[in-house]
Swiss-Prot record:
Residues 423-839 are annotated as: ODF. Decamers of large identical subunits (350 kDa), each containing 7 globular oxygen-binding domains: ODA, ODB, ODC, ODD, ODE, ODF, and ODG. There is a cross-link at C63-H65, C479-H481, C897-H899 (2'-(S-cysteinyl)-histidine (Cys-His)). Binds 2 copper ions per heterodimer. This is Hemocyanin A-type, units Ode to Odg. SUPFAM superfamilies: C-terminal domain of mollusc hemocyanin, Di-copper centre-containing domain. Keywords: Copper, Disulfide bond, Glycoprotein, Metal-binding, Oxygen transport, Repeat, Thioether bond, Transport.
Length: 1233
């Protein structure tokens, strides 16, 4: 296979003959003046310009920067260069210069001025040292000004800037997030090699004329390949993008021009970005090795990226766009008082002929360590001061970049739960229906027939066969027993089996057998002798009944002990009590010992004294019951984890045996493991969160008790004095049952059995703490008072008999003599949870107001409108727009209301509260009612439409000397879709679905805008104008509902276990004062005290509450389930990057096929005005266009257009320059991990 591809090798690992072929091929290529020569191909990048077409009057550079197709264009470009080089005699692909590792110098291959041919001994100039730019002059060559940044050698334990930032790029799981991080890091090499030299790598116009460009971009492309391999390891798509879909079918120029400009038929034919993903198949090259800093793909993910994600991190975010020049940006972190510390830096590559570009998401650079050194928290008050210097040394105005934002990414364990599809939910084996049983049996039959490494024999051999420490020198079995990582090894092992079952057609996750429940026989799945296979129309042996052991040419057997059904059997039974004692433990390693030994009991009770059975460490995994047993075992660990979380104790980490948790487990980590999923999950410390492994359990109840009830049951057992037999266990090279007797004098009673699972090839193990068996009931049965245990010379003692699995009685001294431990009763005081103090004012649905409520509100509003003080209507309404009361540093006045920014919800929460408190001061006993416009309505609320004696009908605008008016549009009432298909419902449901506050805010705000536009219509003094909207009393009912929607989202976040009273994005903006609420002129002490975004999340502290937080009749848990159901379908979104346009407008768009057939795509509104505060979102507003595409019979990846029309509220059509072209991205159905 290797002969079919050109191999790109590390430039430092080229052989003499390979270097020789590259040098001479490139010399020939530089002399070639045709379209296949070096300078012709170098011109593809920028100058002389060829785009948009060679004959266009105004041309620009063809290279794509600052957009999602940057990697695609440059992948094709390196192929263009590589194949030309190959045609000129090169025997290998374009070598790559790996700058991700610490370097001391630029490789000689590209730095030396001369090259001495090792075969002819003739010295010639090194063509890779520089390039000629003949279109300027014959004497013009590229220059280099190498920066010391390139030769960074970090202190021990730290990595270089380049490595850290590439690792951050590789961490991303969304292609467009990866792309922006990759591109900006790549820019640094351009900057650090070219410096201030004009004809250099640091100038977009001339970069491609320096031969180092191609070695640099070979490495950039290799990093993309590494990311693709990581995506495959993660189980995510590596060969297509789900974002920027509109760009993926646009041919890349000038490659698509063909002859005479491009003489390469392959790059002409395969010139669409979508062709670039499968580089080996389409372009026939590969890399010698895919590593970073000597870390393999698996190690990058498991040992580095996951480790980084386990930490709380803070980033500065920059929304970048082109400004016609290369530049270097540095920034400082500054606190009040002027003290500043160096933050970090990044580069932009540009030139005057560059194609216009703007990213639609933030470039992130980590500042965690800087803040830590400054003793600052992520939400401390600090500013980021950015300095931008152009390539020629000119300092550019800081305003060329939007203000940097601060983002916090909490440790990954705090991420949202992964939505697990039904076929990844492990259920009780007794709850399976006939179809489930048939499916599992058919899948296991196929797994058993599979003789590959995905088949049963290989999987079963992982447990007990002699494979470790390496297949080359096998000494013992790989399974981990008798050590703290026993649960982790078996968690990933069961996952490995389950993945194979799914690969062979199983649509049912591995069920669990709850052996603590009463029973008289094994479950049907495990015990039926045969089953009917509907596919083959045959009656076949039940594959779960036994397993074949190829190496022994025999089948597994079972010797089920009657005690299995005697010691199980519900509350009071031995297994129940043993599991309860296990779950009682609060230290992970204490839990693990109890857990493992209880699990051993089932191996013994099913396998008995048989060799090829569950009771043998070597052969237990060949009996399929093993996997159903271990599904229950893993579930018990999950229950303990839930208990620990309930106790506010560590549940996703251990503070013991730390040395074992960081080492990848064998054989899963080996390259011979064909399952990339389990290979990536082979490190114990990453296995605590089973949701991230792609499965969960139907429930975590134990004998009908939820976690809270289970904890109470544990407390009941702890409320009594107890005595335990304590065993210090270690490996004895065999499976054995240890029979315990409690004796007084010569009288003895059976006290229980401890089973040890082992074998002659077991990995050596000793527990470092004891296994405890409760013998309190035996003492009571023998009428031995607990006090007698303390009597000197007492004859109370323990005796053991040890019987190996083959029936031999072992010397009782094979294990240390157990001791007795007395544990006194614990007392528990039940904590009484205090409910959050409810606000004194309740906001009701406007349609549920009583006549007395309505009268009270109208009377109070009339009094507020008559009040000319700072707490009167005119003053409060002016907070939003005109008269202008906020000022820039230069004195220019602007409207204080915050729109198009993260604090929009917070600012309007305070304004609504300000008006509400004014109403309360004038006699209202109810809060501002909310108008729920997400439900179907045919008219505006009666509260605001009755004309007679109604202060809510309109209000006077003193500053304009006129009254407010409304001009509702037809679409406000005439939505043809109802219920969960209606316009407002769909917009708000999409907002509520978001789990990041900034994602929610954008969807939420733009959804709210439509009410402003459609109620106010063309009225200049109404809801549709930012300047005067707050003078219409309806504004406050609208914003009461808007605030309630935010409150619903907050309740959803709380239910999801995610931040709800804080945000992890744009943190620096959330700590800034919200004017004018913070000013001394504000008479409201409550809004003044909460006049930042950060302090206004908790609305209970503002003294109000809602009558309920239901959404369309759904409670918060029901709403969350409904939102998840919505996500179970593929959806396609148009993304609009919105910013200030200085007026209110409606945006309508159609989706059109390339043949011109169009259908309505959607509509949304922008609320603005001449005096609005400047704003720009840092991420796209998403609009679902799935239905529109279905109407046109289009798929997300098809070629289509989105035609946008922007209309001002006065009906005039506005220029499309106000909006960037929309992007398209796919949100795949959440049905697979």
């Amino acid at each position: 296979e290797g002969n079919e591809y050109l191999v790109r090798k590390n430039v430092e690992r080229l052989s003499l003959s390979e270097m020789n072929s590259l040098i001479h091929a490139f010399r020939r290529m530089q002399k070639d003046k045709s379209s296949d020569g070096f300078e012709a191909i170098a011109s593809f990048h920028a100058l002389p310009p060829l785009c948009p077409s060679p004959t266009a009057k105004h041309r620009h550079a063809c290279c794509l920067h600052g957009m999602a197709t940057f990697p695609h264009w440059h992948r094709l470009y390196v192929v263009q260069f590589e194949q030309a080089l190959h045609r000129h005699g090169a025997t290998v692909g374009v070598p790559y210069w790996d700058w991700t590792r610490p370097i001391s110098k630029i490789p000689d291959f590209i730095a030396s001025e001369k090259y001495s041919d090792p075969f002819t001994k003739i010295e010639v100039y090194n063509p890779f040292n520089h390039g000629h730019i003949s279109f300027i002059s014959e004497d013009t060559t590229t220059k280099r000004e190498v920066s010391e940044y390139l030769f960074e050698h970090p202190v021990l334990g730290k990595q270089t800037w380049l490595f850290d930032n590439i690792a951050l790029a590789l961490e991303q799981t969304d292609y467009c997030d990866f792309e922006i991080q990759l591109e900006i890091v790549h820019n640094a090499i351009h900057s650090w090699i070219g410096g201030k030299e004009e004809h250099s790598l640091n100038h977009l116009h001339y970069a491609a004329y320096d031969p180092i460009f191609y070695l640099h971009h070979s490495n950039v492309d290799r990093l993309w390949v590494i990311w693709q391999e990581l995506q495959k390891l993660r189980g995510l798509n590596a060969y297509e993008s789900h974002c920027a879909l509109e760009l993926m079918k646009v041919p890349l120029k000038p490659f698509s021009f063909g002859a005479p400009y491009n003489l390469n038929d392959l790059t002409t034919k395969l010139s669409k970005p979508e062709d670039m993903f499968r580089y080996k198949d389409n372009f026939h090259y590969e890399y010698d090795i895919l590593d970073i800093n000597s870390m393999s793909i698996n190690q990058i993910e498991s040992s580095y990226i996951r480790h980084q994600k386990d930490h709380d991190r803070v980033f500065a975010g920059f929304l970048l766009s082109g400004f016609g020049s290369s530049a270097y940006a540095t920034f400082e972190i500054c606190i009040e008082g002027g003290e500043c510390h160096e933050g970090s830096h990044f580069a932009v590559l540009g030139g005057s002929t560059e194609m216009p570009w703007a990213f639609d998401r933030l470039y992130k650079i980590e500042i965690t360590d800087v803040l830590s050194d400054m003793h600052l928290a992520f939400d401390s008050a600090f500013t980021i001061k950015t300095k931008i210097v152009a390539q020629n040394g000119t300092e550019l105005p800081a305003s060329i970049l939007p203000e940097a934002t601060v983002i916090r990414i909490p440790p990954s364990k705090q991420d949202a739960d992964i939505d697990i599809p039904l076929n990844h939910i492990r259920r009780n084996v007794e709850s399976l229906d006939e179809r489930d049983i048939q499916n599992l049996m058919a899948a296991l039959t196929r797994v058993k027939k599979d003789e590959s490494d995905h088949g049963f024999q290989t999987i079963a051999s992982y447990h007990g066969s002699t494979l470790c420490p390496s297949p080359e020198e096998p000494k013992y079995a790989c399974c981990l027993h008798g050590m703290p990582v026993f649960p982790h090894w078996h968690r990933v092992y069961l996952l490995h089996f389950e993945d194979s079952m799914r690969r062979h057609g199983s649509s049912v996750a591995t069920p669990y057998w709850d052996w603590t429940q009463p029973g008289t026989k094994l479950p049907r799945l495990l015990a039926d002798s045969d089953y009917y296979d509907a596919w083959t129309d045959n009656v076949t042996e039940n594959p779960f009944l036994r397993g074949y052991i190829t190496s022994e040419d025999t089948y597994t057997v079972r010797d089920v002990k009657p005690e299995l059904f005697e010691i199980g059997g519900g509350e009071g039974s031995t297994l129940y009590q043993q599991v309860l004692l296990m779950l009682e433990q609060e230290d992970y390693c204490d839990f693990e010992v109890q857990f493992e030994v209880v699990h051993n009991s089932i191996h013994y009770l099913v396998g008995g004294h048989q060799k090829y059975a569950m009771s043998s460490l070597v052969y237990s995994s060949f009996d399929p019951i093993f996997y159903v047993h271990h599904s229950m075992v893993d579930r018990l660990w999950a229950i303990w984890q839930a208990l620990q979380e309930h106790r506010h104790l560590p549940f996703d980490k251990a503070y013991c045996a730390l040395e074992q948790l960081s080492f990848p487990m064998k054989p899963f980590v080996w390259e011979s493991n064909p399952n990339l999923h389990t290979r990536a999950a082979s490190t114990p410390q990453h296995l605590f969160d089973y949701n991230k492994l792609g499965y969960k359990y139907d429930d975590l109840e134990f004998h009908g008790m939820n976690i809270d009830q289970l904890e109470n049951a544990i407390h009941k057992t702890q409320n009594k004095d107890r005595v335990f037999a304590s065993f210090l266990l270690f490996g004895i090279k065999t499976s054995a049952d240890v029979h315990l007797k409690l004796c007084k004098d010569e009288t003895c009673e059976d006290a229980g059995v401890v089973f040890v699972l082992g074998g002659d090839n077991e990995m050596p193990w000793p527990f470092d703490r004891t296994y405890k068996m409760d013998i309190t009931n035996v003492l009571h049965k023998m009428h031995i008072p607990l006090e007698d245990l303390y009597v000197h010379g007492s004859t109370i003692h323990l005796e053991v008999k040890i019987e190996s699995v083959d029936g031999k009685v072992l010397d009782s001294s094979s294990l240390p003599v157990p001791s007795m431990i007395y544990v006194p009763a614990k007392e528990f005081t039940k904590e009484i949870e205090k409910e959050a103090v409810r606000g004194t004012i309740i906001r009701k649905n406007v349609n549920s107001l009583t006549p007395s409520d309505i009268k009270e509100l109208r009377d109070a509003m009339a009094k507020v409108q008559a009040d000319t003080s700072d707490n009167g209507y005119q003053k409060i309404a002016s907070y939003h727009g005109i008269p202008l009361s906020c000022h820039y540093e230069n004195g220019t006045a602007y409207a204080c209301c915050q729109h198009g920014m993260v604090t929009f919800p917070n600012w309007h929460r305070l304004l609504t509260k300000q008006m509400e408190d004014a109403l309360v001061a004038k006699g209202s006993h109810v809060g501002i009612p909310y108008w729920d416009w997400t439900t179907t309505f045919a008219n505006l609320p009666v509260l605001v439409t009755e004309e007679k004696d109604n202060s809510f009908h309109h209000a006077h605008i003193d500053v304009a000397n006129t009254d407010t008016t409304r001009s509702p549009r037809a679409q406000l009432f005439d939505d043809p879709e109802k219920g969960d298909k209606s316009f407002f419902y769909r917009q708000i449901a999409l907002a509520l679905e978001q789990t990041d506050f900034c994602d929610f805010e954008i969807q939420f705000e733009i959804g709210h805008n439509a009410i402003h536009s459609w109620v106010g219509g063309s009225s200049p003094y109404g809801m549709s104008t930012l300047h005067y909207t707050s003078y219409d009393p309806l504004f406050y009912l609208h914003h009461s509902n808007t605030d309630r929607i935010w409150s619903v989202w907050q309740a959803l976040q709380k239910y999801r276990g995610l931040p709800y009273n804080t945000a992890n994005c744009e943190i620096n903006k959330l700590v800034k004062p919200l004017k004018p609420f913070n000013l001394d002129t504000n008479p409201n002490a409550v809004t003044k005290a909460h006049s930042t975004g950060a302090t206004s999340f908790d609305y209970h502290k503002l003294g109000y509450d809602y009558d309920n937080l239901n959404f369309h009749g759904m409670t918060i848990p029901e709403l969350e389930e409904h939102l998840k159901e919505i996500q179970h379908e593929d959806r396609v979104f148009a993304g609009f990057l919105l910013r200030t346009i200085g007026q209110s407008a409606d945006v309508n768009f159609d989706v059109c096929t390339k043949d011109g057939e169009c259908t309505f795509g959607g509509t949304f509104c922008i609320l603005g005005g001449e005096h609005e505060m400047f704003w720009a979102f840092d991420r796209p507003f998403k609009y679902d266009i799935t239905t529109s595409l279905k109407h046109l019979r289009l798929d997300a990846h098809d070629d289509f257009d989105i035609k946008v029309t922007i209309k001002g509220i006065d009906g005039h059509v506005l220029s499309n320059k106000y909006l960037s072209p929309p992007t398209v991205f796919l949100a795949p159905a959440k049905t697979t991990h």
